[in-house]
């Protein structure tokens, strides 16, 4: 069972308004945790390692580092695929600095199941999910960007490789952007296949473009939901921190 006790991580709950609007949801027989963020109001960040190069891996070390700057996590989840040493597999941009380059070739595994894509937030807070080859051709200036794959929804269409009755069901998380610019983080709390997860993003969450992030190491930190999931170390972490003052 996933541990969801903030106290176990030494993370207190401050009396303040959450930056993310997070709710548990149910769609047919499947349960989800969904958080909606206005990227023009809240700063979505990517985190990987501290100043010494040590990968955070979990929410507690990241929160300890944020505390030194007067901040605390409000929302976070694993932010993309990574190598065994937890380096990002594809494009990774944090604070406007590219750490890893974009990968546009077809390859093994979910990441290489084209089309894959990039979640990008630019310097004025506009967020987009962009197909990887279109991203490479456009080369937008992103304040943060993370590449993953496959795309779940591409311009309103499900990824063509998804099979409705597939028995490959896992806990999964992903990110999408609505037509009004709001960013939607979603985590499946019951195992789902790609087709079901993508359909949920398109039809229920109303995101015409959405990106799969991970399907094995899937965890959520949500102050509003009282969750700080524990488990194996992660690579990139995506989310929102807020000031504790």
Task: Describe the function of each predicted region.
Residues 29, 113, 146, 169-171, ...:
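Residues that act as N-cap/strand-start positions at coil-to-secondary-structure junctions
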Residues 4-14:
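Bacterial N-terminal signal peptides
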Residues 87-162:
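Active-site-adjacent helix-turn-beta-strand microarchitecture at beta-sheet edges
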Residues 89-105, 161, 165-173, 177-209, ...:
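Conserved, well-ordered active-site substructure
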Residues 73-75, 117-118, 126-128, 150-151, ...:
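Structural motif
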Residues 17-110:
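Zymogen propeptides
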Residues 49-52, 133-137, 187-191:
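Short, solvent-exposed aromatic-acidic interface loops
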């Amino acid at each position: 069972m996933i541990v969801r006790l903030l106290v176990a991580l030494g993370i207190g709950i401050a009396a303040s308004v959450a930056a993310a609007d997070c709710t548990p949801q149910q769609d047919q027989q499947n349960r989800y945790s969904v958080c909606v963020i206005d990227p023009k109001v809240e700063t979505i960040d990517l985190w990987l390692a501290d100043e010494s190069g040590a990968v955070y891996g979990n929410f507690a070390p990241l929160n300890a580092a944020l505390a030194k700057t007067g901040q605390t996590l409000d929302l976070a989840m694993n932010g993309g695929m990574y190598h065994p040493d937890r380096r990002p597999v594809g494009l990774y941009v944090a604070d406007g600095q590219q750490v890893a380059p974009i990968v546009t070739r077809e390859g093994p595994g979910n990441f290489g199941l084209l089309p894959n894509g990039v979640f990008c937030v630019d310097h004025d807070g506009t967020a987009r999910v962009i197909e990887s080859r279109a991203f490479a051709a456009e080369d937008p200036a992103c304040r943060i960007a993370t590449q993953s794959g496959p795309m779940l929804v591409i311009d309103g269409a499900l990824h063509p490789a998804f099979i409705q009755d597939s028995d490959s069901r896992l806990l999964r998380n992903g990110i999408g952007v609505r037509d009004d610019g709001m960013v939607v983080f979603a985590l499946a709390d019951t195992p789902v296949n790609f087709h079901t997860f993508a359909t949920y993003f398109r039809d229920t969450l109303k995101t015409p473009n959405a990106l799969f992030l991970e399907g094995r190491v899937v965890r959520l930190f949500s102050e509003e939901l009282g969750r700080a999931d524990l488990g194996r170390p992660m690579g990139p972490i995506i989310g929102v921190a807020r000031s504790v003052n």
